[in-house]
Amino acid sequence: MFRGINAITIDTKGRLAIPTRYRSALGAEDKIPLVVTIDTEETCLLLYTAAQWQIIEDNLQKLPSFNAAARRIQRLLIGHATDVEVDANGRVLLPTVLRNYAKLEKDVVMIGQGNKFEVWNKELWESKREQWLAEEASMTDGLPEEMKTFSL
């Protein structure tokens, strides 16, 4: 399980250094590829283990092919999905098209989300986080039904 926020610098070649504490869980020592794709809801990237991505891709493939919204999601997520390998120094090369989509330049954050990481432009992340905290503080609708029995 991946959790926590890690501030990272992308080098001039577009390589992202995976924090040491996650490398074995991601299969870096075994040269198992990771999969990176776009997030269709936010301006960030999603980084999965190959095994976790396969589950998601299988589910995406099961969506109805005559549904325009389903095809759009398939095109975006599967179409942008790229296998990336962890090099000997624990880095992955993020494709230019994906870095451009997420506005990743130098300072980024990796945010653990359980089964995946989100990779954000640091300034964009800080702005969104402040927005979400403000929205949470001013919520008048209350929690969604699914969360009313949830406890921390």
Swiss-Prot record:
GO CC annotation: what is one?
Answer: nucleoid
Give the UniProt subcellular location, in the record's own words.
Answer: Cytoplasm, Nucleoid
**Cystines in this chain:** none
Q: Enumerate the Pfam families for this protein.
A: MraZ
Q: Which residues form the SpoVT-AbrB domain?
A: 5-52, 81-124
Single Gene Ontology MF annotation: DNA-binding transcription factor activity
Keyword Transcription assigned: yes
Gene Ontology BP annotations = negative regulation of DNA-templated transcription initiation
Q: Which UniProt keywords apply?
A: Cytoplasm, DNA-binding, Repeat, Transcription, Transcription regulation
Cited InterPro entries: MraZ (IPR003444), MraZ_C (IPR035644), MraZ_dom (IPR020603), MraZ_N (IPR035642), MraZ_sf (IPR038619), SpoVT-AbrB_dom (IPR007159), SpoVT-AbrB_sf (IPR037914)
Q: How does it assemble?
A: Forms oligomers.
- Record-linked NCBIfam families: division/cell wall cluster transcriptional repressor MraZ
State the family named in the UniProt similarity comment for this chain.
Belongs to the MraZ family.
* HAMAP family reported in the protein's UniProt record: MraZ (MF_01008)
Q: What is this protein's name? A: Transcriptional regulator MraZ
The gene it comes from is mraZ
